[in-house]
């Protein structure tokens, strides 16, 4: 005798909003614990306790700690990084495109010590999840490399392997997560300007427009 499939009742807008709010709360609390204790030292039990919820409820939202880290990565990229890429792609001048990208990326990395966790713990994700995160960064790579190539072809940029220059520029911004003093947020704008100026002054021929 066949069982009749049960139709799940669709969520109301209020229920959907509550779910989104709860997910955001879980992501933030988990990320706070990853920053405070380290990813490896943080258990799902600790996260559930900090949220004042039972573990089964936490597993309803995320089946594993690795999946939770992945969802936090995606959420952060969608909210903070992808908008930078969208903005950069609309800038026609390649020098201005690089300047915008480097400045915004530096500010993103300097905004919170959570940036260090997300950069460093990419290695803790499964290969499948790493590939999905890397696909977003591949888009950033192509934007930056394309601008480098345009500047070289126009004679404004120094010759050199495009990939080296791309990793050099983005690496300058990303590496600050390992040494920046996050208690000195008033210096982040100065740092962003410096990273941008140092890279462009080293790469561009002076006086060429």
Model features per residue range: what roles?
Residues 75-86, 128-153, 163-167, 193:
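Amphipathic alpha-helical packing segments from all-alpha helical-bundle domains
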Residues 36-40, 91, 112, 154:
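Short coil/turn segments at alpha/beta junctions that flank glycine-rich nucleotide-binding fingerprints
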Residues 25, 29, 33-67, 71:
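Helix-turn-helix
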Residues 21-30, 47, 72-76, 80, ...:
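Generic hydrophobic, amphipathic alpha-helix propensity
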Residues 71, 85-111, 165-169:
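Hydrophobic alpha-helical connector segments
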Residues 116-120, 130-134, 152-198, 206-209:
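Hydrophobic/aromatic-rich alpha-helical bundle segments in the mid-to-C-terminal region
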Residues 62, 120-125:
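Short helix-capping/turn signature of helix-turn-helix
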Residues 1-21, 207-209:
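N-terminal intrinsically disordered/low-complexity leader segments
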């Amino acid at each position: 005798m066949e069982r009749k499939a049960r139709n799940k009742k669709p969520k109301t807008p209020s229920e959907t909003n509550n779910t989104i709010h709860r997910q955001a709360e879980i992501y933030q609390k988990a990320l706070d614990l990853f920053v405070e204790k380290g990813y490896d030292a943080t258990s799902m039990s600790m996260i559930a306790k900090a949220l004042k919820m039972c573990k089964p409820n936490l597993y309803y939202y995320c089946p594993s700690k690795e999946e939770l880290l992945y969802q936090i990565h995606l959420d952060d990229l969608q909210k903070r990084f992808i908008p930078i890429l969208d903005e950069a792609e609309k800038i026609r001048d390649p020098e201005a495109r690089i300047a915008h990208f480097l400045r915004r990326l530096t500010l993103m990395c300097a905004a919170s010590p959570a940036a260090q966790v997300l950069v460093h713990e990419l290695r803790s994700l499964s290969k499948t999840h790493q590939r999905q995160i890397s696909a977003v960064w591949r888009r950033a790579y192509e934007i930056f490399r394309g601008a480098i190539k345009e500047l070289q072809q126009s004679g404004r940029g120094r010759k050199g392997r495009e990939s080296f220059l791309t990793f050099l520029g983005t690496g300058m911004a990303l590496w600050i997560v390992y040494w920046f003093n996050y208690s000195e947020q008033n210096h982040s704008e100065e740092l962003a300007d410096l990273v941008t100026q140092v890279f462009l002054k080293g790469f561009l021929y002076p006086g060429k427009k």
